[in-house]
A protein has these predicted regions:
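Structural signature of Gram-negative outer-membrane beta-barrels, strongest in the C-terminal barrel
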Residues: 15-19, 23-27, 65-204
């Protein structure tokens, strides 16, 4: 859900084009593991489209992730003169991510899980059950100068952050491996700067 309010007004000789709002999102993702299927070899130069793997069956492995985010934001474009503009904005996010996963035990190869005592091979065993919460501050600022009616030059700078689990709703246990989704890791931060020019060369 997103509610946005826009307003245009003046403070003295400076024009403002303001956009403010609040946003609430809930994103969920569920993945299921399936039993492997062995298919016959295929000639890549003469593929056989009649080969079918048959129905896939779940093996008990699964992963469930959910992220709730509440945000407020405000952006303003200031018309300083006819040709010169300043712009800036800030967004504050509060997030909470929950994640759990289970793997079929007794398999082989990388990432295989040993079955606990008394648990049959192939049974799902919980491997991760964790959560992460926090606050993020993202902002940007810039300036633009109109050289002509059809062209301008601009400069922008922005700071954005992505918390663990922010791109795939998956978390990793604290202290385990080098995944960026570990719950003891800080959000990843990106600083972006840009200088450029834009020109309208086609008739509108």
């Amino acid at each position: 859900n997103q509610t946005n309010l826009t307003s245009t007004f003046y403070t003295g000789s400076i024009g403002h084009d303001v956009s403010t709002g609040v946003e609430f999102t809930r994103e969920t993702q569920t993945n299921y593991g399936v039993n492997p299927v062995t298919l016959p070899a295929v000639n890549i130069y003469h593929p056989d489209s009649s080969i079918h793997p048959g129905g896939l069956t779940r093996n008990g492995a699964n992963a469930n992730g959910q992220t709730d985010t509440f945000a407020i934001y405000a952006f303003d474009t200031l018309q300083i003169t006819r040709d010169f503009e300043l712009n800036g904005g800030i967004r504050l996010d509060n997030y909470h991510t929950e994640y759990d996963s289970a793997t079929a035990c007794g398999g082989s190869g990388r990432g295989a899980i040993t079955c606990p005592a008394g648990v049959a091979k192939g049974s799902p065993v919980t491997t991760v059950d964790t959560a992460k919460s926090g606050n993020l501050v993202n902002w940007k600022a810039g300036a633009l100068y109109h050289l002509t009616e059809n062209g301008n030059i601009y400069i922008n700078y922005a700071v954005s952050q992505q918390p663990p689990g922010g791109n795939n709703f998956a978390l990793a246990q604290s202290g385990s491996g080098n995944s960026a989704n570990r719950t003891d890791f800080k959000p990843q931060k990106a600083n972006t700067s840009e200088i450029g020019t834009k020109w309208q060369v086609l008739d509108k």
